[in-house]
Amino acid sequence: PDMIRRASRGLTSEIVAGVCKLMSNLDLIYAAKKMRVTAHCNTTIGLPGTFSSRLQPNHTTDDPNGIIASVMEGLSLGCGDAVIGLNPVDDSVESVARILKMFDEFKRKWEVPTQICVLAHVTTQTEAANKFGAPLDLMFQSIAGSQKGNEAFGLNAAMLDEGRATMLSRGTCTGPNVMYFETGQGSELSSEAHNGWDQVTMEARCYGFAKRYNPFLVNTVVGFIGPEYLYDSKQVTRAGLEDHFMGKLTGIPMGCDACYTNHMKADQNDIENLATLLVAAGCNYIMGVPEGDDCMLMYQCTGYHEAAALREVFGLRPIHEFDMWLEKMGFSENGKLTPKAGDASVFLKK
């Protein structure tokens, strides 16, 4: 593993993609398992023996009560040690700041050892921090593997530089890893920003770009764009394993949103298969969405129960501080969920 890590520092993204293309699915699992990439925000992700999840409490109208209800349920089932992260409907600075303050208040009241994030544009989050004093544990941005692709996201490196500087000066985390990036094969092709290169190479370039900012979280949203770029479950599975391997070889702490769209030839069993393979490969985290059905983004991914089930199957635990918090709350005991798990009313009794 040390030799791989040393060699990876000299690899360009194009070489990382080239290596990936030579490998079978089992090769991708076997090699990725050898590579541990950890990062620290408020807690440390990626340590041996751990497996984490992002709690994704999305809501169709950003209703505070609906969002917090999802947060309560997810936490009670052991989700959220990677981050509590919302994709907002309303991308206004005021709304983003309001949700961040709500997350922070809840986190502090219940002493939850995790990170909070609202996945708005980097400039919106920066303004929310500077103008409204919004508490920011992580700065999020979707990124692409070319300048033109990032411009399609309304993004350039200077914006990320400013966002990271804001986090290091005003962020509410201990750091030093303060950034969260999402990627996914096909985004550059959908915006005519691939410059003639294939989607695996373009995805690898995303990870090279991400590495510049020493992120805490990076994940591919592997089947989100749909069958135009990943046709069926076989291709989604392959892409998920490719992305995880390439991220690790690049040297970033890699997770995966194992997901699919409704018009793709895939179902929930396929996504659970991919999630299982990713845990075998040493993936840092997956998503947790109520019932695995995101009512706002309109796609399917892993639910609140999957992370706990996979931890039990593979003998893994959440991030240590979060694991201890789950035991203190009575949601888990010796790494297994208790009968109290899933009872969100625990949070309504105090």
Language-model segments: what does each one mean?
Residues P1-S70, S76, D81-K350:
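Anaerobic metallocofactor- and corrinoid-dependent redox/one-carbon enzyme cores
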